[in-house]
Amino acid sequence: MQLQFKGTNYELTPEVTDQVTKKFDRVKKYLGTREDNAHAYIDMGKVTEAHVSGNVWYADCNLKVAGKQYYAKAEAVSLRNAVDKMVGELGREIRSAQAKEKSLLRKKGSLLKDFFRFGR
């Protein structure tokens, strides 16, 4: 998986990028063999320079895997919390899409089976 980082209103440090890379191991396990051709574009930073308290930090990610695109965004009090929320949301998006694909495959298989059993 290729990760590209961008910082908005914030200077990214190597510690932050290492932390995000470790967090993305949770996402990699859902991708399986499709992990090799996955590209993640991650944007992290402060909402505005003027905000001092509240949900000041945000993290969003566009993940492109095998022609499909997944998007997750989160805002939180700290950058670490925003990254945690974003990775969790991205994992839910991927699992949901995989469940839909599996359901459609089963439905199509059932229809095909019924079609071939019609003549009996």
Describe the residue ranges of each PLM region.
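N-terminal, polar/charged subdomain of small-to-medium soluble alpha/beta proteins
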Residues: M1-R120
